[in-house]
């Protein structure tokens, strides 16, 4: 059962994307609660957030606009620090390396705050993700939190049929010195995580459902990037009341 807050954010994301030519609903809805929990409860002014899975931007834009930012409404976010966006996204596997650089700079300069990076499970197939796991573990960055939206679907189909990667990623991260935890990405598990006492970077595997909240989108690959209109749009908005 989604909260009224979660439903409204999804409705607003549909309206915003429709008005600006957007169509990545599945990945936006799978990470909605992660974004809501982070921005409503976890992030402080000292923290930085990177949406590495840029196609999940429509819920992100909704939340940024609620906070008074005015980001450019494109299909993937681009660097606009004055509007709350600290990394261009779209090409997969780039957010974590950038986040490591930010976290290392903060560590070296004794700056407060953490760096949160939200990634997709499909982009965890990228070599840059694996290289980043190794270097972050070696650098011992306790101020780095990487969250994987593990919805099981990428642009061309189910992850399990293309290159199942998450179990190996978790094992590699632990071997490289990360703290690894699994949560339900659609409830408040993220809020219960103690992120202050770890001396290592933290990898959070958030189990989610692609298209969460709209019955005909849930766990259906075509809704990674499908246009919403007509009766289906009406049904989606009705289900999110």
Predicted regions, residues:
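N-terminal capping segment at the start of a domain
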Residues: 4-22, 149-152
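Cofactor-binding active-site loop characterized by glycine-rich and histidine/acidic residues
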Residues: 14-138
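Generic beta-sheet signal
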Residues: 47-49, 113-117, 144, 198-208
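Acidic, glycine-rich active-site loops and adjacent beta-strand->loop/helix elements
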Residues: 54-57, 119-126, 150-154, 186-188, ...
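A short, conserved beta-to-alpha structural element at the edge of catalytic cores
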Residues: 86, 139-165, 169
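Conserved thiamine diphosphate
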Residues: 111, 160-193
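A short alpha/beta connector and helix-capping loop motif
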Residues: 126-151, 201-207
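Glycine/aspartate-rich loop-and-adjacent alpha/beta segment that forms the canonical ThDP
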Residues: 172, 186-241
């Amino acid at each position: 059962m989604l909260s009224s807050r979660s439903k409204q954010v999804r409705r607003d994301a549909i309206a915003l994307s429709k008005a600006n030519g957007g169509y990545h609903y599945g990945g936006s809805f799978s990470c909605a609660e992660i974004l809501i929990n982070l921005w409503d409860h976890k992030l402080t002014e000292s923290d930085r957030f990177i949406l590495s899975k840029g196609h999940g931007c429509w819920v992100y834009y909704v939340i940024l606009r609620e906070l008074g930012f005015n980001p450019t409404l494109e299909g993937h976010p681009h660097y606009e620090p004055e509007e709350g966006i600290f990394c261009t996204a779209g090409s997969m596997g780039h957010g974590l390396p950038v986040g490591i650089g930010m976290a290392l700079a903060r560590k070296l300069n004794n700056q407060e705050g953490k760096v949160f990076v939200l990634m997709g499970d499909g982009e965890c197939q990228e070599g840059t993700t694996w290289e980043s796991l190794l270097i972050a573990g070696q650098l011992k960055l306790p101020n780095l939190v990487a969250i994987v939206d593990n919805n099981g679907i990428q642009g061309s189909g189910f992850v399990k049929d293309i290159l199942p990667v998450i179990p190996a990623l978790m094992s590699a991260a632990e071997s490289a010195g990360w703290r690894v935890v699994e949560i339900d990405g659609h409830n408040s598990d993220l809020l219960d995580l103690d992120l202050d006492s770890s001396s290592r970077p933290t990898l959070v595997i958030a189990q989610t459902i692609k298209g969460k909240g709209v019955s005909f989108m849930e766990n259906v690959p075509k809704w990674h990037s499908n246009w919403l209109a007509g009766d289906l749009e009406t049904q989606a908005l009705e289900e999110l009341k």
